[in-house]
């Protein structure tokens, strides 16, 4: 039910708190923290979960945190414009499944790990940078940096991840995909991603 202006004026503090909470829920750090919360919960339950169960639990959090359609286009690079719409859609679908499968395969156990998320993202002309760390049980820290983009009408979403703080996952994918596209076209890339996704599921 709509809230009247008079009601908001009579109770400005609760309205202000509600607005602040709503904005905070869509902040870059909140998006990453929610993703990590889901990921950590899956890791803790992993011994009792099949690959498919881990996939199903992770999929909503990943599709919410990651802009997978844009990541697909950026990973393919200039060749994207030469693809037919049906090929673009199919590649987006399989790239999304592949990305989720990587997480479902990789995070299949829990050994006391935890995640830290810096509270203040860093703005740059191309988006927002959120720095995080995976802290292993022995104290070793692995830096994971998320490059996020804010599009109108939605919360910020990840478009690239820098492993160990320096290795761009997007650049790695683009380098690999460009050779496959040159040799086998869209069908060759589709087959590569389908084969890798299947291997992650059974591996």
Language-model regions, residue ranges each:
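N-terminal secretory signal peptides and thylakoid transit peptides that target proteins
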Residues: 1-14
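Sec/Tat signal peptide C-region and signal peptidase I cleavage site
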Residues: 20-24
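Early exported N-terminus immediately downstream of N-terminal targeting peptides
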Residues: 27-103
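Surface-exposed, polar/charged faces of alpha-helical domains
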Residues: 45-49, 82-86, 112, 187, ...
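Solvent-exposed loop/turn segments at secondary-structure junctions
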Residues: 80, 97-98, 136, 164-168
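Surface-exposed, charged secondary-structure patches
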Residues: 100-142, 193-196, 200-203
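Short beta-strand edge/turn micro-motifs at domain boundaries
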Residues: 143, 147-172
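Low-complexity, intrinsically disordered terminal/linker segments enriched in charged
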Residues: 162-203
């Amino acid at each position: 039910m709509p809230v009247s202006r008079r009601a908001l004026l009579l109770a400005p503090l609760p309205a202000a708190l509600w607005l602040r909470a709503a904005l905070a829920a869509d902040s870059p750090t909140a998006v990453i923290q929610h993703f990590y919360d889901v990921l950590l919960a899956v890791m803790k339950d992993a011994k009792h979960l099949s690959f498919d169960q881990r996939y199903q639990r992770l999929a909503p959090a990943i599709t919410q945190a990651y802009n997978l359609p844009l990541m697909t286009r950026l990973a393919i690079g200039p060749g994207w414009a030469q693809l037919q719409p049906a090929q673009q859609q199919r590649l987006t679908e399989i790239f999304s499944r592949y990305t989720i499968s990587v997480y479902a395969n990789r995070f299949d156990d829990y050994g006391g790990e935890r995640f830290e998320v810096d509270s203040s993202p860093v703005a740059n002309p191309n988006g927002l940078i959120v720095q995080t760390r995976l802290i292993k049980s022995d104290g070793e820290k692995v830096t994971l940096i998320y490059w996020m983009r804010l599009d109108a009408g939605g919360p910020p979403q990840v478009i690239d991840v820098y492993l160990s703080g320096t290795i761009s996952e997007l650049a790695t994918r683009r380098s690999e995909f460009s050779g496959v596209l040159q040799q086998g076209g869209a069908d060759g890339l589709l087959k590569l991603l389908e084969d890798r996704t299947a291997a992650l599921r059974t591996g």
